[in-house]
Regions:
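Conserved ABC transporter NBD signature motif
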Residues: 68-83
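Catalytic Walker B motif of ABC-type/P-loop ATPase nucleotide-binding domains
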Residues: 167-171
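Helix-to-loop junction immediately C-terminal to a conserved catalytic motif
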Residues: 60
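Conserved ABC ATPase "signature" region
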Residues: 120-138
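ABC ATPase nucleotide-binding domains
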Residues: 233-235, 239-269
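Conserved switch/coupling elements of ABC/ABC-like ATPase nucleotide-binding domains
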Residues: 216, 220-230
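Conserved ABC ATPase signature
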Residues: 142-146, 150
Length: 269
């Protein structure tokens, strides 16, 4: 249902080279270089204010980089329909009068062009996306009637309707109960099978280790990037979190004294 465009899958879906972003004279991101391939699932972890949200906004084209390059299949991200940015729920006005189906249809806007009404094909994409995330019965609901997990799944449906091949999800699991988190993680499993590449910002190191192919440990710079066993080593975590790192219950389980607040305020305009 989600046919991808004729991209060359031999090249990285996302290639970031020496990316920096300055805000009020300070580096929110400094000399970030990495690449992702098709169907990879990557967790981005780091302390509050580390630049996770800023990274997603620059990669998706919401913010322009101060220096460096971002390429999606060899093209700049601005206006690229293959990339979907899913913001933190705290950044959304949930009282805006719009229903679930109309939000998902917004994913088709780049395909429609200006002053072009949706056609049957567009509604087919919307309905299939809603079925995929199990929200078909709530299509006519106002968005403020949804639970937190349903709101998050609605945004994933919008990205599916967009036919996105790269999804950047900013703290999608934050504030959700365990069943809602498991539903999102199950959706990520399905996206991987459909060759969708996903980057997820999260504070949960255990979830990052158990559910993602690679982990990026970020604190304005990339501290480490690779498989979970290599990245989540004590020396790397101490470099990223410093004194906020502690051992849980005297065991060799490292946790972070970091408040999972609803907004990582490194740069949220």
């Amino acid at each position: 249902m989600y046919p991808h465009t004729d991209h060359q899958t031999s090249q990285p879906i996302l290639d970031v080279q020496h990316l920096s972003f300055r805000y009020n004279g300070l580096f929110a991101l400094e000399d970030i270089t990495f690449h992702l391939h098709e169907s990879e699932r990557v967790a981005v972890v780091g302390p509050n204010g580390a630049g996770k949200s800023t990274l997603f906004k620059v990669v998706s084209g919401v913010l322009p980089p101060t220096s460096g390059e971002v390429n999606i299949f060899g093209s700049r991200p601005h206006g690229h329909v293959c990339i979907a940015y899913i913001p933190q729920r705290s950044q959304v006005d949930w009282n805006f009068p719009v229903n679930v189906a109309d939000v998902v249809m917004m994913g088709r806007s780049a395909k429609l062009g200006p002053l072009n009404w949706p056609h049957k094909k567009d509604w087919d994409y919307v309905h299939h996306a809603l079925e995929t995330v199990e929200l078909s019965d709530l299509a006519s609901y106002q968005i403020n009637q949804l639970s937190g997990g349903q709101q998050q799944r609605m945004f994933i449906a919008r990205a599916l309707a967009q036919e996105a091949e790269l999804m950047l999800m900013d703290e999608p699991l934050n504030g959700l109960d365990t069943p809602a988190q498991e539903a999102i993680l199950s959706l990520l499993d399905r996206l991987k099978k459909e060759n969708v590449t996903v980057m997820v910002a999260t504070h949960d190191l255990e979830q990052a280790a158990n559910h993602f192919d690679r982990i990026m440990l970020l604190n304005h710079r990339i501290i480490a990037f690779g498989n979970p066993d290599r990245v989540l080593q004590t020396n790397n975590l101490l470099r990223a979190y410093g004194g906020r790192l502690r051992s849980a219950n005297g065991e060799n389980i490292l946790t972070v004294d970091d408040c999972c607040d609803d907004g990582e305020h490194d740069h949220n305009h």
